[in-house]
Amino acid sequence: PQLILSLCWGFAVLIPWAAIEGNIKSVVLLFCWLATVFWTFGFDTVYALADKKFDLEIGVNSSAVHLASNTKFTVQICYLLTSVFLAFCALINQLNWIFWPIWLITAFLMQKDTLKIFPESKQSIREIGNHFKKQSIYGGFILLGFVISS
């Protein structure tokens, strides 16, 4: 389910771009789409941890179930790739220096927050919810960085 959601949310990048530009032929668009897909997969995998017990009971092969002991590593890689693809977008668009501290702090916090929900003994509904909420805040900071640095 998390992969499908990630691909669908990726259309939130593709559709407006196509409507404004009239095409989807852009390396920046590709990087934005990839950042969206990886970020969504990462944070929705964390969100799926809250339901992992129920997914196992009813046979749902969520990413939290499928990845098992590789979940932490996968989420960290997803967040790393998200940060890298966003950096490529910023470089290509020659954003000014204001973006980079925002990007660096956000990339660091995304990784740091992952440690708060692993190992599995730390996975309370509250911690998972906080992680999910913080991801939306980080997204807001990244957006702000793009806007004020353009």
Residue map of PLM features:
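Multi-pass alpha-helical membrane architecture of UbiA-family
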Residues: 1-150
